From Swiss-Prot:
The gene is aroD. PANTHER family: 3-DEHYDROQUINATE DEHYDRATASE. This is 3-dehydroquinate dehydratase. It catalyses: 3-dehydroquinate = 3-dehydroshikimate + H2O. The active site is at 116 (proton donor/acceptor), 142 (schiff-base intermediate with substrate).
């Protein structure tokens, strides 16, 4: 799957952007933390679209400035409304609460447990430890780390291959672009690509360019 982030500040703009993005991608990621104001009704609308609902905490590089309690309640509402995926951080102390809520409400939502390092790509043993912890909590493990070299890129591709079908792995930055292009072939559930001028992370490839490259490499 190709996932396109929706990074608008206005809810109506976000819904329109999602409709446009789905002409090119398979799924969108609503970055709810970037919206100026969001209601439970908005979450219901987002959940009708093939999407990942992400409300990234400020301490994990996001923009959510309201209470953690409100964030968790919005994510629960997405689960209640059967959003395709919700994303919650490995470092969030209440992530198991969301999994329990999903299980008790018989929701079809898959829970992504995520980890970010915006400075480096840790050693492979440390990354394996992260992924194993994530898979003990949620359905899908996700990590996004900053790649500085070919070695970093190879580490990330190696882990995609090891955990194929239950991982989303990303190398941020220019050196990590190859992880975005080859990710699907190496076992990542999805890869992120952006609409023109709307990247949500360093090194994100324009979706039209990505599709051209994927077509070329077969």
């Amino acid at each position: 799957m190709i996932c396109i982030p929706v990074i608008d500040e206005n809810v109506c703009d976000a819904i329109n952007s999602a409709k446009e993005a789905l002409k090119y991608g398979d799924i969108v990621e609503f970055r709810v933390d970037l919206l100026k104001d969001v209601t439970f009704e908005d979450i219901e609308e987002f959940s009708k679209v093939p999407s990942i609902i992400t409300i990234r905490a400020e301490w994990e590089g996001g923009n959510w400035k309201k209470s953690d309690n409100e964030r968790i309640e919005l994510l629960k509402h997405a689960i209640k409304n059967n959003a395709k995926f919700v994303d919650i951080e490995l470092k969030e102390e209440r992530n198991l609460e969301l999994v329990k809520y999903r299980n008790e409400s018989n929701s079809n939502t898959k829970i992504i447990i995520s980890y970010h390092d915006f400075e480096k790509t840790p050693e492979i043993d440390e990354l394996i430890e992260v992924v194993e912890k994530e898979l003990k909590i949620g359905d899908i493990a996700k990590f996004a780390t900053f790649a500085h070299s070919k070695e970093d890129t190879l580490k990330i591709l190696n882990l995609m291959n090891k955990y194929a079908g239950k991982i989303i792995a990303i190398g941020m930055g220019e050196s990590g672009k190859l992880t975005r292009i080859l990710g699907l072939d190496f076992g990542s559930i999805l890869t992120f690509a952006s609409m023109e001028g709307k990247a949500s992370a360093p090194g994100q490839v324009d979706v039209k360019k990505l599709k051209e490259i994927l077509k070329l490499i077969g």
